[in-house]
Amino acid sequence: MDRIIEKLDHGWWVVSHEQKLWLPKGELPYGEAANFDLVGQRALQIGEWQGEPVWLVQLQRRHDMGSVRQVIDLDVGLFQLAGRGVQLAEFYRSHKYCGYCGHEMYPSKTEWAMLCSHCRERYYPQIAPCIIVAIRRDDSILLAQHTRHRNGVHTVLAGFVEVGETLEQAVAREVMEESGIKVKNLRYVTSQPWPFPQSLMTAFMAEYDSGEIVIDPKELLEANWYRYDDLPLLPPPGTVARRLIEDTVAMCRAEYE
């Protein structure tokens, strides 16, 4: 439940509006509310980091509003809390009125949900499940440059899970659609909440089975097999894509060195 911010309130401040994050001096604000001119605003505690509260403030600042990507180098736990705040702020902003009856809604006091004051419908933050997979063939890994990544970064394949589809089916479909190959021996690795805008990445490793690379030009600029010790520009540390690549490289080193 949110409340009015008081002078001595302190902690981490996730100040967010329209999927943007307030980053004075390029950093996530930390300290007393008075130092950031937040006294009198409303805040919702969304977690704790190293014993300090993390607050969500739904507010637009005139300056220094940036992307949560700018704080990806934070400790994983704090980055995830910042992402949670951005997603919750957008959820509350976009659910002011009921999609069924059009009446005004209000936030639940017991959970992250919005309740309709008329028909009693209950809405929760939307989460979009995605798969991301590292595909290995002998001493090489399949890496691709996506159309949305025109900075030379090469990464593993990924995509959204469709309605009525299992995660395993999503991997097989996305890999075939984007690269034209089949995979086998699929293994779950980890997951990562990814607030761009509201994804949950489920990460897998797989082995090449058959087929030749035929890219989908709507999704990829190019794709190729890269030997583990001769890789192109990779995604930044802290991303699940980077972890998958590094795990694959470690497996190759263990076998080929």
UniProtKB/Swiss-Prot annotation:
Q: Does the keyword Metal-binding apply?
A: yes
Q: Which cofactor does it need?
A: Mg(2+); Mn(2+); Zn(2+)
Q: What family does the Swiss-Prot or TrEMBL record give for this protein?
A: Belongs to the Nudix hydrolase family. NudC subfamily.
UniProt cofactor note: Divalent metal cations. Mg(2+) or Mn(2+).
Q: Where does Zn(2+) bind?
A: C98, C101, C116, C119
Reported EC number(s) for this entry are 3.6.1.-, 3.6.1.22
User: Its biological function?
Assistant: mRNA decapping enzyme that specifically removes the nicotinamide adenine dinucleotide (NAD) cap from a subset of mRNAs by hydrolyzing the diphosphate linkage to produce nicotinamide mononucleotide (NMN) and 5' monophosphate mRNA. The NAD-cap is present at the 5'-end of some mRNAs and stabilizes RNA against 5'-processing. Has preference for mRNAs with a 5'-end purine. Catalyzes the hydrolysis of a broad range of dinucleotide pyrophosphates.
Q: Which GO terms describe its biological process?
A: NAD catabolic process; NADH metabolic process; NADP catabolic process
Name of the featured protein: NAD-capped RNA hydrolase NudC
The protein's assembly and partners? Homodimer.
Which positions does UniProt annotate for a divalent metal cation 1 binding? A158, E178, E219
Alphabetical list of NCBIfam families matching this protein: PRK00241.1 (NF001299)
Note the PANTHER family from the entry.
NAD-CAPPED RNA HYDROLASE NUDT12, NUDIX HYDROLASE, NUDC SUBFAMILY
- Gene (name only): nudC
Reaction(s) catalysed by this chain's protein: a 5'-end NAD(+)-phospho-ribonucleoside in mRNA + H2O = a 5'-end phospho-adenosine-phospho-ribonucleoside in mRNA + beta-nicotinamide D-ribonucleotide + 2 H(+); NAD(+) + H2O = beta-nicotinamide D-ribonucleotide + AMP + 2 H(+); NADH + H2O = reduced beta-nicotinamide D-ribonucleotide + AMP + 2 H(+)
Q: Where does a divalent metal cation 3 bind?
A: E174, E178, E219
Specify the Nudix hydrolase domain's residue ranges.
Answer: 125-248
- Span of the annotated motif Nudix box: 159-180
